[in-house]
Amino acid sequence: MLVLSIRIKVWQTMESEITKRIVVPELEDILYKEHKVLDKGFVRLVDYMGSDESVVQAARISYGRGTKSVSQDAALINYLMRHSHTTPFEMCEIKFHIKLPIFVARQWVRHRTANVNEYSARYSVLDHEFYIPELDHVATQSEDNAQGRGNSLSNEDAQYVTDLLKRDSDMVYETYNKFLIKGVSREISRISLTLNYYTEWYWKIDLHNLLHFLRLRSDVHAQYEIRVYAETMLEIVKKWVPLTYAAFVEYCLESQSFSKSALSVVKKLIAGEDVAREDTGIGKREWRELMDVLADK
């Protein structure tokens, strides 16, 4: 075993010395490490290709590192991001191993620009692991957003909800086990399980489409349970491509876009004019969102 261990270490050392691929030390440090998300989930980086350098190289259609400075690279990446030149960002790819509740996975796969291979409950038995929200995340239905949360319930009501969720989740797993013991096929037995049970998958995507995913899913309006995954992945992207990340924050993540009518309102307000919503043709919701942006809420 000692000889084998030495050989493995020598091979790993040789590999790191002879590789010609772009290596990001900050990512090498976290390869295969679990980043805990929710109560039992995680995000684990398993592979990546490229870096900020790859984006710049693709944009310049050149080979090698060249002689450009970091400031010039940053300026170019800012330009690409600002003007939505997406192809250079597609030259970088990243692959994650993710453990997440099934209901989160069903939202996630609406982003169809990634490669996914999921744990199959047709071939394997699912573990007795399910998601139960923290009490402060159990809330009423939002009154102005058909797919969002409103105010948090009282601790007593939230505890009642989570107790029932746990009871039902345990109960359906007991039923699942009974089916398996009876010899019922795994593909039928799994039907009894609830959407809060955990699944796992490998998820590979290019940088451009990853940023689009993260812009939508890290937004405050995204469901909390998927947002925390996006926030974890954002931190990994920050280590991977810091120049691209900075441009993304500047021009996408923390920027605002306006409709033609909203932009007209902004111009009038800057000019000191009084503007009434009824005179603009803007709906109540868009108007409220515009006023919130201008008030920096």
From Swiss-Prot:
Name the UniProt record assigns to this protein: Flavin-dependent thymidylate synthase
Q: What class of enzyme is it?
A: transferase
Q: Does the keyword Flavoprotein apply?
A: yes
Primary role: Catalyzes the reductive methylation of 2'-deoxyuridine-5'-monophosphate (dUMP) to 2'-deoxythymidine-5'-monophosphate (dTMP) while utilizing 5,10-methylenetetrahydrofolate (mTHF) as the methyl donor, and NADPH and FADH(2) as the reductant.
UniProt cofactor(s): FAD
Q: List the InterPro entries hit by this protein, alphabetically.
A: Thymidylate_synthase_ThyX (IPR003669), Thymidylate_synthase_ThyX_sf (IPR036098)
Cofactor: binding comment: Binds 4 FAD per tetramer. Each FAD binding site is formed by three monomers.
